[in-house]
């Protein structure tokens, strides 16, 4: 376990015990954020001067990975909350940060990243889904965010990139569930991770002003936060792969010992990629070279699938018996989510192919 997690709270067993219930949506989804906050996990990688425990963004990646080893649903929620916190840390709007950061760090309130659409917009994959019409110093917002996680029913704040009707540079705003014109849908009918408070947001004639603006220039802000957005997300892949490989090694006895060299090879490559994430964040390489992070994301997703396959092979028929190994069945469907989380593997592969084509032209 990461040293910073050990220093905060070593008792993460609650997430293991409740993993199946949250995956199936059979537990109170609103309890996840307070449980994560109670253990001080949202403070990891946040400057002490702002109420955090210090450290770097990579410490947050490792914290999410530690939770993902126990429950991908909890890690998914953790990613949404911690990523919104990162937006506040990088926003020039100090009043917005001062208002919301304390409650987000403690887990009293939920933060959600609605910037998946913006990240795809940066790559020319899709247009922005919210539109702002200016009225004096304020704007009127309309549109829909079809898939957002950590929309806690007890209350949430969500970041979104907004196209301006006058053609000015898109901006990034923060909306709350209590604002008139902001409506949360019922939970999406997910195959797994059903306790993640994942839903759509409809926005109709919602009034916002300067107090809601995270950044006036989405084209400047989003590339700057993208390394944290993606790297924190990679914590889910890292944690899921680690627990699958560790289980494969534990079960790799007798006739299954033939798998151990392959388990070792995949584990070594996994940790090499983890080191590349750490170094890329520290050097800020991913700001100037996002393609390097895209390639890591793609390879980590492939490693998750390999790790789960090795766990299955090492466990044998036991993996297919619910009364003997429920964790594997849960991890198998959790793993199916890794390739499709935004930006999906096909979207990243398309972006890399487009960049390669541009270089050849």
Regions found by a protein language model. Give the residues of each.
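Generic N-terminal amphipathic, Lys/Arg-enriched alpha-helix
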Residues: 1, 9-19
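Glycine-rich flavin
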Residues: 28-38, 42-142, 149
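A short core secondary-structure module
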Residues: 147-182
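Glycine-rich beta->alpha junctions and the first turn(s) of the following alpha-helix
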Residues: 188-271
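Amphipathic alpha-helical coiled-coil segments and their boundaries
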Residues: 227, 234, 259, 286-289, ...
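Generic structural signal for well-ordered, non-transmembrane alpha-helical segments
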Residues: 239, 264-271, 294, 298-305, ...
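Glycine-rich phosphate/cofactor-binding loops in nucleotide/flavin-utilizing enzymes
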Residues: 317-361
């Amino acid at each position: 376990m990461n040293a910073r997690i050990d220093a905060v709270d070593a008792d993460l067993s609650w997430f293991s015990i409740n993993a199946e219930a949250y995956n199936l949506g059979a537990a109170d989804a609103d309890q996840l954020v307070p449980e994560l906050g109670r253990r001080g996990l949202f403070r990891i990688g946040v400057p002490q001067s702002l109420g955090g425990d210090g450290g770097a963004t990579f410490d947050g990646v490792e914290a999410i990975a530690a939770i993902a080893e126990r429950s991908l649903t909890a890690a998914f929620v953790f990613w949404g909350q911690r990523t919104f916190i990162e937006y506040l840390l990088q926003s020039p709007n100090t009043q917005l940060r001062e208002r919301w950061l304390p409650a987000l760090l403690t887990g009293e309130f939920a933060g959600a990243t609605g910037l998946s659409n913006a990240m795809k917009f940066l790559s020319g994959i899709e247009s922005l889904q919210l539109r702002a019409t200016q009225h004096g110093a304020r704007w009127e917002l309309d549109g829909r965010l079809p898939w957002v996680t950590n929309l806690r029913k007890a209350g949430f704040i969500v970041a979104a990139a907004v196209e301006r009707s006058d053609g000015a540079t898109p901006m990034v705003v923060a909306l709350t569930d209590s604002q008139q014109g902001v409506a949360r849908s019922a939970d999406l009918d997910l195959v797994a991770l059903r306790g993640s408070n994942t839903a759509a947001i409809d926005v109709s004639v919602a009034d916002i002003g300067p107090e809601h603006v995270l950044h006036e220039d989405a084209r400047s802000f989003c590339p700057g936060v993208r390394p944290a957005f993606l790297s924190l997300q990679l914590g889910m892949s890292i944690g899921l792969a680690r627990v699958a490989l560790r289980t494969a090694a534990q079960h790799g006895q007798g006739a299954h010992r033939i798998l151990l060299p392959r388990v070792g090879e995949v584990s070594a490559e996994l940790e090499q990629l983890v080191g590349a994430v750490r170094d890329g964040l520290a050097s800020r390489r991913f700001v100037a070279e996002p393609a390097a992070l895209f390639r890591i994301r793609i390879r980590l997703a492939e490693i998750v699938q390999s790790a789960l396959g090795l766990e299955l092979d090492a466990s044998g028929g036991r993996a297919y018996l619910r009364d003997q190994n429920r964790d594997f069945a849960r991890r198998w469907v959790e793993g199916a989510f890794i390739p499709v989380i935004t930006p999906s593997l096909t979207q990243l592969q398309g972006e890399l192919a487009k960049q390669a084509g541009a270089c050849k032209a």
